């Protein structure tokens, strides 16, 4: 069970974190491209937190992917499932709204023998497009002994249309076998946008929605620069945490993945979900504040 405070001597201990998810290539309207994926952003945050990281990922041989793998290998031990092509996200702006399309298809199939040799203190499940199906989740669950499991839900909450466009997927509509595996997690992290919400300020409704489908884990729903909502099984109502000020003028790509990684690390140290979320929020804020052009601004009360 998760503790309410760090065990003696563990606050400075290097936590062994296993991150699982596919790499991506992001292509933008101006023709540029960059490596991406929750596994990359989460590993960067874990490295900043001085965790010892192992990554299980899938990717092809494109130049952007090789760049990402070089970076990952500088921060973590990498177990690679080679695929014909890396998943590609195409970004588009239409009528002032951003649209995302997906090219390719990946299903991660971690090797049981490799998994059984791993002894992570915590696992972060971080798919980008459903590559962790019930088979993969069950394999990981049965093969890896670990104290804490955390899932970043984004990759399960994307539904691909016939033309490749990605639309929000309803959590309750996921396969029951996937939901059953996710209910075994200690915590789940998701943004309100991935849940299909457009509220600017944190609201308890989204966390209640997640808890209806996943009543077991602690729930953290992030609201970008505005704050987050925290829900735990033993509390009837979620707790809304609003920021008093925000970091503006810099992109927040990867911030949610970094938040999830630090939450996972802190839970593995024995922190409560409340303390883990505070640490993660502060870590993301420090990271954003160091970016060129970052400006602190008060938020409306």
Predicted features by range, described:
Residues 2-14, 173-176, 202-301:
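Conserved phosphate-binding/catalytic region of the ribokinase-like
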Residues 10-17, 24-33, 48-150, 301:
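Conserved N-terminal subdomain of the carbohydrate kinase-like
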Residues 22-23, 258:
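Active-site metal-binding loops of divalent metal-dependent hydrolases
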Residues 29-35, 162-164, 199-202, 291:
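Short, solvent-exposed loop/turn segments at secondary-structure boundaries
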Residues 43-52, 265-269:
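Alpha-helix C-terminal capping segments
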Residues 44, 88-91, 227-231:
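Short beta-strand scaffold segments in enzyme catalytic cores
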Residues 55, 186-187, 218:
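Well-ordered beta-strand positions
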Residues 122-206, 226-227:
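Conserved beta-alpha-beta core of the PfkB/ribokinase-like small-molecule kinase fold
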């Amino acid at each position: 069970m998760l503790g309410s405070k760090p065990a003696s001597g563990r606050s400075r201990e290097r936590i062994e974190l296993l991150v699982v998810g596919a790499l991506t290539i992001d292509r933008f309207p101006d023709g540029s491209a960059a490596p991406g994926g929750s596994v990359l952003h989460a590993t960067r945050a874990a490295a900043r937190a001085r965790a010892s990281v192992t990554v299980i990922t899938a990717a092809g041989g494109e130049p952007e992917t090789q760049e990402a793998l070089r970076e990952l290998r500088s921060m973590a031990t990498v177990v690679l499932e080679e695929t014909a092509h890396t998943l590609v996200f195409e970004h588009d702006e239409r009528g002032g709204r951003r649209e995302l399309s997906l090219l390719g298809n990946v299903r991660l199939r971690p090797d049981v023998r490799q998994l059984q040799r791993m002894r992570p203190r915590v696992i972060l499940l971080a798919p980008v497009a459903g590559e962790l199906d019930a088979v993969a989740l069950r394999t990981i669950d049965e093969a890896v002994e670990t104290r804490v499991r955390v899932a970043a839900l984004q990759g399960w909450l994307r539904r691909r249309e016939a033309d490749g466009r990605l639309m929000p997927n309803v959590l309750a509509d996921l396969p029951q076998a996937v939901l059953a595996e996710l209910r075994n997690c200690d915590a789940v992290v998701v943004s309100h946008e991935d849940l299909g919400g457009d509220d600017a300020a944190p609201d308890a409704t989204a966390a209640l929605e997640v808890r209806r489908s996943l009543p077991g884990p602690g729930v953290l729903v992030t609201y970008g620069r505005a704050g987050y909502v925290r829900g735990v099984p033993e509390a009837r109502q979620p707790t809304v945490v609003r920021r008093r000020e925000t970091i503006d003028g810099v992109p927040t790509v990867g911030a949610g993945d970094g938040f999830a990684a630090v939450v996972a690390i802190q839970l593995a140290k024995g922190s409560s979900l409340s303390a883990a979320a505070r640490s993660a929020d502060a870590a993301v804020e420090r990271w954003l504040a160091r970016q060129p052009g970052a400006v602190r601004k008060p938020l409306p009360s």
